[in-house]
Amino acid sequence: MKTLSASACLAIWERGAGHHPARQALHLLNAAWPEVGPDMLAQLSLGQRNLLLLRLREQLFGSQIESVVGCPGCGQQVELTLDVRDIGGQPDQEFLEPKAPYFFSQGDYQIHFRLPNSLDLLAIGPDQEATIARNALLARCLVLAQQGDQTISSDQLPLEIEAQLIDQMAQADPQADIELAITCPFCARAWQVGFDVIHYLWRELTAWAYRFLGDVHTLASEYGWAEGDILALSPWRRQAYLAIIRGT
């Protein structure tokens, strides 16, 4: 994994601002794993993608994740603190390859499928109604479906086979849809909440970018330096100049 500089992070943020979250994720992965290649990264399963994003998040902002969620029982705000390594492991080089298609059979149905990836999310788009998006995703990920010796399409699958397909996908790629188990310290209500890795990471990147650009503005205003000169400074030197300006 490549270490990303401040200027690289700014470029990624600017390039991905306002884009589909799947596109934002690919911008980050392409910058951090250039040796893998954009085509290969785009074909990684969503669980593989999320684990790489968590690893990158640890490089950029540290391993500790903090958030606040509202308790559905008492309405109190519950603070969460967790480690990225508690959510997923550290992927090795073999992990950086798309997974082969999977197979299961039930009754006289034989189902071959692959796992959803970033290209699927980009093709479906962010604004589709949930049922339409799910059906489109299943259609894209269904490699081959047969009833006996007859090939059938995804919309011909019985509901129980469709449910089995969704369950098989979830079991094969558990980090694709990360759920955090939470217990409220105020009322002891237990529930689960989804953790959207790219949403959280991009929000952090945006907050960092605004803080960093504020520092650039401060240094440029005080010393008349160009943005490129400020970005070329080491983080320690930038902070030293900022401390001088602020008198700390």
Where in the sequence are the language-model features?
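Long C-terminal interaction/binding lobes of large macromolecular proteins
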Residues: 1-248
